[in-house]
Amino acid sequence: AYRDSRFKSRDRGRYVITGIELRLNKVPACNVSYGPLKEHFAHLPADEVSPAAVRERVIAVRQSKLPDPAVLANAGSFFKNPVVSVEKAAELKKTFPGLVGYEQPEGTKLAAGWLIEQAGWKGRRLGPVGMHSEQALVLVNHGGATSVDVLALASAVRRDVWERFGVSLEQEPILLP
């Protein structure tokens, strides 16, 4: 599944991944279903979309949304997009018409970045850490942060999203002791 694996569930904490082996198709199949890719390649027939073009576009999209870790320390997306029941999503949509959600087989996946932004955390800092000003889902270290700082911010964001929406955010990075 997208951004998930057995190492985040049944084998969590049992292994440290030090290498991988890939089996690649000789005939590429480009998946451009992600919104910005779909829009960018909409004018082309599917068989004219090359892996190199998709790669270049993915890099451009990521650079426009995410801070460069070499410039501003971060771990990328810090919270998973929560999945709620269809009923809960409909209830939230009545109160928050701009709610961003995507139907899934198991319910509705909500955009955690949108929830965090609406809870007032986009671009906001708590000491040396904060949520990125361009992408509210990304927790950044402005310099000198400790794990205590990171966890305090994560807890505050989680609390505020829960209080505003009644939705729990799950941390995505796995922390090592």
Language model segments and positions:
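Phosphate/pyrophosphate- and phosphate-bearing ligand-binding catalytic cores of soluble enzymes
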Residues: 1-140, 144-148, 164, 168-177
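Conserved ATP-binding N-box helix of the HATPase_c
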Residues: 161
